[in-house]
């Protein structure tokens, strides 16, 4: 018969070698599983729609949209990572040490690549708004694709060098049933700087510059300073500024969702608190495609086209879609 103390262990038959589990009422577990599973499914589904839309429709094959595709891929992966975190609701890991390491590595590579994609998108918008005449030559599809590949490669390389227990899965666990990354305190501080503080500074500086240019252009248009010859470029800048505003919303949501998780992890908060902010951290991946749905008519049009299975028709990739940068 299992005693109350043994009921709080992940592996009761191992006694003190087992990690302690978080005991919650059954109704709370059911509610959490339903909510978190729904978030996971929605995250995977919505980001899959973004991936299909940009990949399938050739009219959307622009440098900015390929950077957005990278962000959607990372958000899509987050939906699967979330499944592992649902398994950790009671603070117990019941899968093998190899799967634990896979989860840990993926949970660092994907958010790091997501942050890198956000930075690349910010740079893209900065060049498009602040240097529109040279944008077509500076930012090409090939350069965007190379940037995306380098972003993911550096994220993987960074993650492999970050973890101390990568070569010995489960060898440094304090108890059986634990699945946590092992990092030196100095490395944790360095990680916070490289994956949050530094990217946030770069993003904020770029968007402040974009905002200043947007305001100056608006004033110039209102005071009729713009020369007639520049009307064409001003029209282009309007669409670029619209894209910059939408991506500005993406960046703000990104910072609001990611900052609490990094602050709590650096301060070694309690597990329950950390789990809440970790969910907020992953919830950002669900919000991104929802932002596109609300702000971009072309995305809603693509979704209808995909869900009606019209993309299976011959020549559907050439379907006319309003070509806007995301």
Set out the residue ranges of the language-model regions.
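Extracellular N-terminal segment of 7TM GPCRs
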Residues: 1-45
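Loop architecture of class A 7-transmembrane GPCRs
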Residues: 11-23, 92-108, 137-145, 152-204
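Juxtamembrane loop-transmembrane helix junctions in multi-pass integral membrane proteins
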Residues: 20-34, 56-62, 66, 95-101, ...
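Extracellular TM2-ECL1-early TM3 structural module of rhodopsin-like
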Residues: 22-37, 63-123, 128-138
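Helix-to-loop junction signature of class
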Residues: 36, 53, 77-92, 104, ...
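Alpha-helical transmembrane segments of multi-pass membrane proteins
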Residues: 40, 70-79, 112, 147-159, ...
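Seventh transmembrane helix
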Residues: 202-203, 253-266, 276-326
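Intracellular effector-coupling site of seven-transmembrane GPCRs
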Residues: 212-261
């Amino acid at each position: 018969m299992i005693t109350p103390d043994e009921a709080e262990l992940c592996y009761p038959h191992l006694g003190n070698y087992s990690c302690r589990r978080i005991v919650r009422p059954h109704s709370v577990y059911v509610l959490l599983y339903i909510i978190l599973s729904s978030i996971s499914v929605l995250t995977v589904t919505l980001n899959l729609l973004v991936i299909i839309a940009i990949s399938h429709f050739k009219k959307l094959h622009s440098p900015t949209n390929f950077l957005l595709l990278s962000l959607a891929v990372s958000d899509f992966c987050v939906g699967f990572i979330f499944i592992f975190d649902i398994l950790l609701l009671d603070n117990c890991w019941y899968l093998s040490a190899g799967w634990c390491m896979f989860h840990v590595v993926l949970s660092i590579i994907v958010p790091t690549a997501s942050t890198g994609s956000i930075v690349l998108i910010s740079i893209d918008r900065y060049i498009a708004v602040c240097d529109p005449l040279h944008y077509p030559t500076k930012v090409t599809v090939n350069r965007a694709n190379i940037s995306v590949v380098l972003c993911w490669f550096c994220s993987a390389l960074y993650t492999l060098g970050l973890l101390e227990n990568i070569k010995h899965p489960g060898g440094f666990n304090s108890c059986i049933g634990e699945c946590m990354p092992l990092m030196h305190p100095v490395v944790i501080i360095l990680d916070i700087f490289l994956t949050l503080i530094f990217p946030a500074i770069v993003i904020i500086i770029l968007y402040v510059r974009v905002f200043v240019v947007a305001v100056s252009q608006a004033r110039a248009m209102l005071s009729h300073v713009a020369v007639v010859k520049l009307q064409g470029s001003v029209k282009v800048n309007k669409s670029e500024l619209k894209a910059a505003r939408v991506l500005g919303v993406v960046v703000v949501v990104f910072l609001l969702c990611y900052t609490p998780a990094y602050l709590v992890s650096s301060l070694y908060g309690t597990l329950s608190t950390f789990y809440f902010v970790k969910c907020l951290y992953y919830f950002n991946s669900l919000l991104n495609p929802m932002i596109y749905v609300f702000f971009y008519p072309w995305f809603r049009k693509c979704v209808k086209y995909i869900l009606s299975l019209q993309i299976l028709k011959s020549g559907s990739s050439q379907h006319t879609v309003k070509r806007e940068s995301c």
